[in-house]
Amino acid sequence: MTEQTYLLMHRHINGYGRLFGGQLMQWIDELAGIVSMRHAGGRITTASIDNLNFKAGAYLNDTIVLIGRITYVGRTSMEVRVDTYVEDLEGMRRVINRAYVVMV
């Protein structure tokens, strides 16, 4: 399991005042890459991002937490689930996204 945390800044926000979906997709891909490289002990490539579900928005100055874990390992590929949360000042987290990334 790997966890990364980000503070949402103006450069991460779209024209509607929410986290830009493309930015979140980049963070998901990077985290899935780290998780799978640690498991494989070598280089990997993203094959696909499946089932990318946006459940809620995130806004300027929100703390974003991404948690990645391997859910399947095959002979030539693996699947990484990445859950994304907004964390409040008390440490409570609410899910805003879940994605499954296939790495080869």
In which residue ranges do the predicted regions lie?
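Hot-dog-fold acyl-thioester-processing enzymes
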Residues: M1-S48, V104
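Conserved beta-strand residues within beta-sheet cores
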Residues: T5, T46, N51, V65-I67, ...
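Active-site beta-strand->loop segment that positions catalytic residues and contacts the acyl thioester
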Residues: S48-T63, R69-R75
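HotDog/MaoC-like acyl-thioester-processing domains
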Residues: T2-Q4, Y59-L60, T71-V104
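Short amphipathic alpha-helical surface micro-motifs
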Residues: L7-L8, W27-L31, V35, N61-V65, ...
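Short, well-ordered turn and helix-capping elements at secondary-structure junctions
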Residues: H10-H12, I49-A56, V86-D88
